[in-house]
Amino acid sequence: MSQFDSAAFIAGFPLKAHNTFGFDVRAQFACRIEREEQLMAAVRDPRAAGLPRLVLGGGSNVVLTGDFGGLVLLIALRGRRVAREDNDAWYVEAAGGEPWHEFVGWTLAQGLPGLENLALIPGTVGAAPIQNIGAYGLEMVERFASLRAVELATGDVVEMDAHACRFGYRDSFFKREGRDRFVITSVTFRLPKVWQPRAGYADLARELAAKGHADTPPTAQAIFDAVVAVRRAKLPDPLELGNAGSFFKNPVVEAAQFEALKTTEPEIVSYLQPDGRVKLAAGWLIDRCGWKGRAMGAAAVHERQALVLVNRGGASGTEVLALAKAIQRDVLERFGVELEAEPVCL
């Protein structure tokens, strides 16, 4: 007998409130998952056999181009705790359905700094490793210890360390070989007891200076507050204007290509990488192509941040993808650089 209550299968479930673009689409079936055991039972349930599956947490990294003909698993796993500590770090575990920003704020309230640069990133804890989220000089992988996940094909629980997750820039095993195969149910982070502020990014440094930290080292809370202020000034609230945050990755090019670009574009915004390659600011490339503030139907490029595509009201996922492809085409033609979309497009 399945542990999965048949009432949990909801037919024709509306997904508008479950994706931050606000696309008005539906799922053939949906199920709200509040316990790991429930997830294990759900994926083994005969009624789910043969159905395509889509895992949604905050829905902040997905473009839904139409109704989903399968089972949507709505991850609502909650809980957070200090699991253990050693001489060097605290190990903090959070359930996959915990809202990311709330979790970061909670760690600071417990006196556990280390994640403050990642404040206000949309989505859930379980989505953070998939994307290897990063911002303002910090990537999640630098604070990652391990995770638990349920394999959708079997319902078995697996534990994975950083090596198994194969993290890269906005990338992981879960976006490649592991795509659509696992649901991350909890993540454990390693927060060092010896904390050092990271405040080198220009926007962040300016905000901190404006708040009185020009000559004194900022606290973790000050960095958190500054990141929130900077992000709110640049990025629209998905509750007010549908979006998925940064739509494109910052491309990384070889040094020779960068030097060639610099001869024709001396103001190009760039960041030298440890391996000698150069990361380019995708927003600058898009802006230079004249896309900031432009629209195609109800899909548009945000007027303050060219990296953000928005739903001005009634746009479909197909319209947003058409806009994204037009931007990619223009950037490639002008700079010879291919932009890669961050969200998963379905």
UniProtKB/Swiss-Prot annotation:
InterPro entries: FAD-bd_PCMH, FAD-bd_PCMH-like_sf, FAD-bd_PCMH_sub1, FAD-bd_PCMH_sub2, MurB, MurB_C, MurB_C_sf, Oxid_FAD_bind_N. Signal peptide: none annotated. It catalyses: UDP-N-acetyl-alpha-D-muramate + NADP(+) = UDP-N-acetyl-3-O-(1-carboxyvinyl)-alpha-D-glucosamine + NADPH + H(+). It is found in: Cytoplasm. The keyword NADP applies. It holds the Pfam family FAD_binding_4. GO terms for cellular component: cytosol. Keywords: Cell cycle, Cell division, Cell shape, Cell wall biogenesis/degradation, Cytoplasm, FAD, Flavoprotein, NADP, Oxidoreductase, Peptidoglycan synthesis. GO terms for molecular function: FAD binding; UDP-N-acetylmuramate dehydrogenase activity. Belongs to the MurB family. Cell wall formation. This is UDP-N-acetylenolpyruvoylglucosamine reductase. It comes from Paraburkholderia phytofirmans (strain DSM 17436 / LMG 22146 / PsJN). The gene is murB.
